[in-house]
Design a protein with these regions (language model features):
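Glycan-recognition surfaces
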Residues: 1, 5, 45-152
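Aromatic- and acidic-residue-enriched carbohydrate-binding clefts of CAZyme catalytic domains
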Residues: 1, 25-52
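An active-site-proximal structural segment forming one wall of the substrate-binding cleft
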Residues: 1-21
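Conserved, mostly hydrophobic/aromatic
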Residues: 22, 67, 140, 207, ...
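Catalytic cores of secreted or luminal carbohydrate-active enzymes
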Residues: 134-185
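Carbohydrate-binding surface patches
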Residues: 186-229
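Solvent-exposed beta-hairpin/edge-strand motifs
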Residues: 226-240
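C-terminal beta-strand-rich structural cap/linker in extracellular carbohydrate-active enzymes
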Residues: 245-272
Length: 272
């Protein structure tokens, strides 16, 4: 009740529309003088039930606020918490290359709309890797997109590019967050990662590909899209090129060779 009252007052007194609920330590050596020795195992379970109660009260009272759950370490996604908070901070590791595996695996169990995925500064604070703003965006745009950057350190060109990225994401957001998600290349076993989303009505296709390391001699990858109508035609919204659905699914898209590590491509198709 104390926690509820304290948080309630803060939310009432301030114009807050987003709360990240973080618990950056694990419960260790937990015990209670109240329970007998054979009931000590109940404590962590009761703790979680108490947390769910707090969430139930606060999210019901402040339904207009977006709550995001979070925790350090692995296993942070909890279906129980997702009942109260519709998204979770997927990982503190925001490096675009690492995120390929993180998001590939997380999406096996949880919807992409629940995966917090942000464009962060480079060199990355976790691994020290530098990737382009475009690659960071394309990887983050496979989840619930956000940016965590110091605007004072961005160039004017970067600011303009971010504006364009956000505008583009708004056009594909419904497809990415609620459409069908198809994995086309596995970053765990390949030197690439690729995926495509299909909107609920089948009218928009979002295809993305990331090359991890550039190589001198290799077979140029061809990716076959999935979930399309083989009898329909699809237009590349950027170039105006038109492809048959059967062509995209059975012949596939040939990825141009790029002599650069961590290069990425996104293509948006519209069903004609």
């Amino acid at each position: 009740d104390y926690v509820i009252a304290a948080v309630r007052q803060i939310l009432k007194d301030n114009p807050i529309d987003y709360v990240k609920w973080d618990m950056n330590r694990h419960l260790t050596d937990v015990g209670s003088m109240y329970f007998e020795p054979d009931r000590q195992g109940e404590i962590t379970h009761r703790y979680v039930l108490g947390l769910y109660y707090i969430m139930d009260v606060l999210t019901s009272e402040f339904s207009e606020i977006l709550f995001e759950s979070c925790s350090s370490g692995g296993g942070r996604f909890d279906p129980g918490m997702l009942y109260y908070m519709p998204q979770t901070w997927t990982s503190d590791n925001t490096d675009a290359v690492c995120r390929l595996k993180i998001q590939h695996g997380t999406s096996m169990l949880f919807p992409t709309v629940s995966m917090g995925a942000h464009v962060s500064a480079v060199p990355n604070h976790q691994v020290g890797r530098t990737t382009s703003l475009e690659t960071r965006y394309i990887v983050a745009a496979a989840g619930n997109l956000g940016y965590e950057l110091d605007l004072q350190k961005l160039s004017q060109d970067e600011m303009e590019l971010i504006k364009k990225q956000i505008a583009q994401y708004k056009r594909i957001r419904r497809t990415v967050q609620f459409g069908a998600y198809y994995r086309l290349a596995d970053p765990f076993s390949e030197n690439q990662s690729a995926w495509n989303f299909v909107s609920e009505d089948g009218k928009q296709i979002v295809f993305s590909h990331v090359q991890i390391l550039a190589r001198s001699a290799y077979r140029i990858p061809t990716l076959r899209l999935r979930g399309l109508d083989p009898k329909a035609e699809y237009k590349n919204v950027e170039t105006g090129e038109v492809f048959g659905g059967d062509e995209l699914m059975y012949a596939g898209i040939t990825i141009p060779r790029v002599r650069q590590d961590f290069s990425a491509t996104m293509i948006i198709f519209e069903k004609m």
